Amino acid sequence: MATRRPVTFVKTMLTGNATDSPKRTRDYFFSPATPAEVVNDCHHRLQPESTQALKDMMSPLHPERVTTPVAVLGAEHDWLVAPPKELAATARAYHTTAQTLPAGHDMMLDTAWQRAATAIETAITGHHAHR
């Protein structure tokens, strides 16, 4: 978000609030295919994010300290977290591959939620099968 929408990034970091309309909620969290009623319902439930939590998310990661398998899932319509190049770099850092789903940032609330759930289930059951 910082490089693609710097003003929104600064506003969010200062206030914890990035969405002031259902349109922004759709743009930030959902794919274009998500029904308006889902977007509107989620918009009305949103509350400001903790500014401390936002700062914590900016801390560097240490993949070399991670000893458990990691599933890296990204969303095709997610511009909040990681563009495809960064998603692939994250997967490489954790010695795995990234899977991109046809969804927005809130992939479990989007139209492709079943694909997201299946990807998570596959990662978990695959991990347990190799124990």
Q: Which stretches of residues belong to each language-model region?
A:
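Flexible "cap/lid" loop of the alpha/beta hydrolase fold
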Residues: 1-14, 53-60
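Conserved alpha/beta-hydrolase catalytic His-Asp/Glu region
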Residues: 17-58
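Alpha-helical elements of Rossmann-like donor-binding domains used by nucleotide-donor carbohydrate transfer enzymes
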Residues: 41, 85, 89, 115, ...
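Short alpha-helix in the alpha/beta-hydrolase fold that links the catalytic acid
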Residues: 58, 82-91
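Short, conserved loop/helix-junction motifs that constitute active-site signature segments
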Residues: 63-67, 91-94
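Short beta-strand/loop motif that positions the catalytic acidic residue
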Residues: 66, 72-74, 78
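Acidic catalytic loop of the alpha/beta-hydrolase fold
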Residues: 76-81, 106
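Catalytic active-site module of serine/aspartate enzymes centered on a nucleophile-bearing elbow/loop
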Residues: 94-131
